């Protein structure tokens, strides 16, 4: 006989039912707080910047919606013992684990993929109210913790000088950035 025990956080309840919801005049963080409030969880949600006219959760689980909105804001989201935490990664803290190959780490398999790293990124949308095109050049993320290969070196691999993202929705310049 084999006993298989699958242990999960109570947040697994958020991963089952697909739902549809509308959030008006709210920030992403406020919409997430409203969703989590319907469950018996505590929260630690970092406040997001953009106030949306409307946010639509369409045919997706609460957890998938939370993850997608937090990812769009550059935040990570975890469930930890009945608490939903969403915040920017803090890389200034102390090292939690010193991995030494052969001692604390017996095997390591990693891949590096430059397919989605571009030299320059430009986002464009249509402003319905002013009947004009809005174009924003992306800022460098300033994230230098990805090893000894710079983002510009990775962007040069496929030799794509500029990549255009086009949004069909009416989004603000801040959201395009």
Regions found by a protein language model. Name each.
Residues 1-177:
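Amphipathic alpha-helical and helix-coil boundary elements used as assembly
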């Amino acid at each position: 006989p084999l006993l298989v025990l699958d242990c999960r956080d109570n947040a697994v309840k958020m991963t089952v039912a697909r739902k549809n919801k509308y959030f008006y005049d709210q920030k992403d963080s406020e919409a997430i707080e409203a969703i989590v409030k319907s469950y018996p969880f505590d929260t630690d949600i970092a406040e997001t910047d953009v106030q949306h006219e409307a946010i639509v959760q369409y045919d997706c689980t609460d957890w998938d919606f939370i993850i997608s909105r937090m990812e769009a804001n550059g935040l990570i989201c975890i469930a930890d013992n009945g608490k939903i935490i969403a915040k920017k990664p803090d890389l200034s803290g102390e090292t939690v684990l010193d991995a030494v190959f052969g001692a604390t780490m017996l095997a390591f398999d990693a891949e590096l993929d430059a397919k989605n790293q571009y030299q320059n990124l430009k986002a464009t949308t249509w402003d319905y109210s002013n009947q004009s095109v809005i174009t924003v050049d992306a800022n460098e993320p300033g994230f230098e913790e990805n090893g000894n290969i710079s983002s510009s070196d990775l962007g040069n691999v496929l030799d794509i000088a500029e990549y255009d993202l086009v949004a069909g929705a009416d989004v603000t310049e801040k959201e395009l950035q």
